[in-house]
Amino acid sequence: MTEIQKPYDLKGRSLLKESDFTKAEFEGLIDFAITLKEYKKNGIKHHYLSGKNIALLFEKNSTRTRAAFTVASIDLGAHPEFLGKNDIQLGKKESVEDTAKVLGRMFDGIEFRGFSQQAVEDLAKFSGVPVWNGLTDDWHPTQMLADFMTIKENFGYLEGINLTYVGDGRNNIAHSLMVAGAMLGVNVRICTPKSLNPKEAYVDIAKEKASQYGGSIMITDNIAEAVENTDAIYTDVWVSMGEESEFEQRINLLKDYQVNQQMFDLTGKDSTIFLHCLPAFHDTNTLYGQEIYEKYGLAEMEVTDQIFRSEHSKVFDQAENRMHTIKAVMAATLGS
């Protein structure tokens, strides 16, 4: 086996939110993931976690996160064990503290995807092993590594990139893009109706990172201002998990913020890429899509099918990169 050097000594560390790491560490993980992607492509084994056991805790359903952690674990030589919402009793029949102490005795690392940021923080506090946040209502750090890896693959650099997020400014993707982008020296623009502006607490964290690392933060409801000369347009679903009752309200608020060809024309450049963490409502080929069309007459929601399937779209590279970046995090924090 050809050995490769991990980017930094992150052994024993947890990834709970982007600001847990420095700019150098975060970009180091991205570069490490790019290397691991080449290793996988070329069939070079990289069993950094041979003999390790990984707990995958999922309160929320997932396709990409579960698949990425599972394949990443196996590629690294570890054994992943999935524990779904019917298998774990976090805070219900058993406290998070007690659960963490039990799992920490049996597993070498723990992934958590759920609602509460406090839950993932407590898992890390009490388990005694590295814990990785696969998504909470507040932050989505593993997604950020994949997103900025995809941007770096397309442009060759991150510092000075203009990134525009269009949609609900209060969700975890918007929070994480602001903070991770600011840490990496990216100019992050959040384009959202004023009523969906991100909370000041998250904006303040991002602005502090921007002043430290050279990025910038813009919050605006002006689409033309937000996308002018931007390198990447990013959107997410208009309604997050657990908010399904708010579809009509969100559609009314965000229908003018759909990512479409007109928006891309406003960028003034041909090289702008499109990003989405998926799943995306870009057609009626799902039960959800059909239901939305029947209720509200919308065949496309946050992005048009034209843009989703265009050469601008890097969403499937982005999805693949979840696996490579998650692998980098696990190997760097748990590997030997």
From Swiss-Prot:
A GO cellular-component term linked to this record: cytoplasm
PROSITE patterns reported in the protein's UniProt record: CARBAMOYLTRANSFERASE
Catalytic reaction annotation: carbamoyl phosphate + L-ornithine = L-citrulline + phosphate + H(+)
This protein's UniProt keywords: Arginine metabolism, Cytoplasm, Transferase
InterPro entries with a match to the protein in the record: Asp/Orn_carbamoyltranf_P-bd, Asp/Orn_carbamoylTrfase, Asp/Orn_carbamoylTrfase_sf, Asp_carbamoyltransf_Asp/Orn-bd, Orn/put_carbamltrans, OTCase_ArgI
Residues reported to bind carbamoyl phosphate: 62-65, 89, 113, 140-143, 277-278, 322
EC identifiers of the protein: 2.1.3.3
Gene3D superfamilies linked: Aspartate/ornithine carbamoyltransferase (3.40.50.1370)
BP terms from Gene Ontology: arginine biosynthetic process via ornithine; arginine catabolic process to ornithine; citrulline biosynthetic process; L-arginine biosynthetic process
Molecular function in Gene Ontology: amino acid binding; ornithine carbamoyltransferase activity
Pathway: Amino-acid degradation; L-arginine degradation via ADI pathway; carbamoyl phosphate from L-arginine: step 2/2
Keyword Cytoplasm: yes
Major subcellular location class: cytoplasm
EC category: transferase
Matches recorded under Pfam families: OTCace, OTCace_N
Binding locations of L-ornithine: 172, 236, 240-241
Keyword Hydrolase: no
Subcellular location: Cytoplasm
Function: Reversibly catalyzes the transfer of the carbamoyl group from carbamoyl phosphate (CP) to the N(epsilon) atom of ornithine (ORN) to produce L-citrulline.
Family: Belongs to the aspartate/ornithine carbamoyltransferase superfamily. OTCase family.
Name of this chain's protein: Ornithine carbamoyltransferase, catabolic
Organism from which the protein derives: Staphylococcus aureus (strain Mu50 / ATCC 700699)
Designated gene of the protein: arcB
